[in-house]
Curated annotation (Swiss-Prot):
It comes from Halorhodospira halophila (strain DSM 244 / SL1). Keywords: Chemotaxis, Hydrolase. Pfam families: CheD. This is Probable chemoreceptor glutamine deamidase CheD. The gene is cheD. The keyword Flavoprotein does not apply. Probably deamidates glutamine residues to glutamate on methyl-accepting chemotaxis receptors (MCPs), playing an important role in chemotaxis.
Length: 216
């Protein structure tokens, strides 16, 4: 989004980093900060004083930042179910589920590193993976297992998590400070979240994993 393209009560949304112009960004009066709202399949990275927001059902989000520079971001993804045993993604590094999860994590981490972040300074927080989508397969559990395994295998520093349960949750992340808030949505089943994630799951089950990402 270009400077001056959107105004809210006289506040101009500043330029974002290249490649994130499609992300919905706005002024959040409660926190007095600009916010970027990401949807399933999206990610966002910033080096400024911004808040990244998403609502998770069975999907998971990884919040990653360089703790010294304050550069960081958040993704929002789930593993596709098609191909192999839907209850066991692990054990096959070439499986569709593993490759999709790796891509979701690596595109986020690579952008942080490209902005000057150092791998040894990265810290991670994980959210989501609720049992929200109906079906025999516990999609949320699979997503949690992948995210935790990825962080462990890559030797990343996991400093916080809010995972599992039966409710959707709203997550707010402030990469500059590393602060994160997770609020469970207890009062409603939140059909919007469920429909959005069901549509996303159908899309990723139908589409091939796009591109190979090498972690540097």
């Amino acid at each position: 989004m270009q400077l001056g393209a959107f105004r809210n009560r006289g506040v101009t949304v500043p330029d974002c980093l290249p490649g994130f112009g499609h992300i919905n960004r706005y002024w959040d009066p409660e926190h007095q900060v600009f916010a970027a709202k990401i949807l399933p399949g999206e990610f966002y990275v910033t080096r400024g004083n911004e808040m990244i927001v998403t609502t998770l059902g069975s999907c998971v989000s990884a919040c990653v930042r360089d703790r010294r520079l304050g550069v960081g971001g958040m993704n929002h993804f789930m593993l596709p179910v098609r191909g192999g045993d839907p209850n066991h993604w692990e054990g096959d590094p070439l499986s569709t589920a593993t490759r999709y999860g790796n891509h979701a994590m690596e595109q986020l981490i690579n952008r942080v590193l490209a902005l000057g972040g150092q791998r040894q300074e990265l810290e991670v927080k994980l959210f989501g993976g609720g049992r929200v989508l109906a079906g025999v397969t516990d999609v949320g559990k699979r997503n949690i297992e992948f995210a935790e395994s990825y962080v462990r295998t890559e030797g990343l520093r996991l400093i916080g998590r809010d995972l599992g349960g039966q409710y959707p949750r709203k997550v707010q992340y402030f990469p500059e400070s590393g602060r994160a808030r997770s609020k469970k949505l207890l009062r409603t089943r939140n059909d919007t979240v469920v429909r959005r994630e069901e549509h996303y799951l159908h899309e990723i089950d139908e589409q091939p994993v796009s591109g190979d990402v090498d972690l540097f």
